[in-house]
Amino acid sequence: MGESPVWAFSSLPRSGPRNDPPQRLPANGLDMLTSMSDDEIHPNAPVALVTMEVRHPAMDALTESSSRELKRLLSEHLPIERQAQDMAWGMGPGGSPTPTADRFVRYVNRDNTIAASLKSEAITVETTSYTNFESFCEVVMRVVDARAQVSSIVGVERIGLRYVLEVRVPVGVDGRIDWANWISEPLIGPQRIAPSGLALTEWQGAAVYREAQPGKSLIIRYGPGIGQALDQNYHLRRITPPQQGPYFLMDIDSFWTPAGGAIPEYNRDLLVTTFQDLYEPSQTVFQEMLTSRLKDDLLRR
């Protein structure tokens, strides 16, 4: 996920773990950032991966007893426990690059479509079977509640919500796609100046939006691709059939960081509220990125 959302977490009393679901968002038009239920899956549904993440100061390593308790708390929805690691490069003696491994535990559902990674400084929940924001937020909060129950979350440094979408449309008779029919004009790049006889087939773009004061930000990465946005060896299973044709990538990363370098106290209610407030600009920008023709097509699927 990219950088980061201003909420005064410290302005309200800290709340302990609870199991009540997040408040329902008010209906404000069509929810385009949804997929289908498992028995309604369309091969061209745009959502490939959704991630919610909370970054926090380093927590104590899980002990044998706390690991057992965490596994028990997550066993109903994420019963499979796996060991995982992230690799990073640092500078070793003499300035030579040295790989370092960040090892952590990951809990997965039986369909291998939802994963919760509990790292020393982050709680990351991902899904390839996204249905809607509220349902996924409930899953995320179950994980956060379980983590907070076995080891206190002492502060919040970043909250993020990320959508990786693959927009697929029919290929023309010449085997190409005129993305101008489907994608909003500002995202089409230099297609309009393509020399005669040549078609623009590749470009990448990025845009960063921030509040005037530190707080919410949104990064959009976009451009056409071939195949899939996710690596074929990604640790989660795709619920849609593999496709190798052209698609248009929309990577929408909405996030929050506290102002002034502060590390506000963790508050469950405000975490849920922040996730909701991050969802709204993601929803808005997604709809703005599509032409009316593509919106109508997605609604028919």
Task: Report residues per predicted region.
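Glycine-rich, often proline-containing surface loops adjacent to acidic residues and nearby aromatics
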Residues: 46-53, 114-130, 156-164, 245-257, ...
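N-terminal low-complexity, intrinsically disordered segments
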Residues: 28-118, 124, 266, 270, ...
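Long, compositionally biased interface segments
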Residues: 242-301
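Secondary-structure boundary elements
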Residues: 132-134, 138-157
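Aromatic/basic-lined ligand-recognition segments
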Residues: 31, 35, 102-107, 158-241
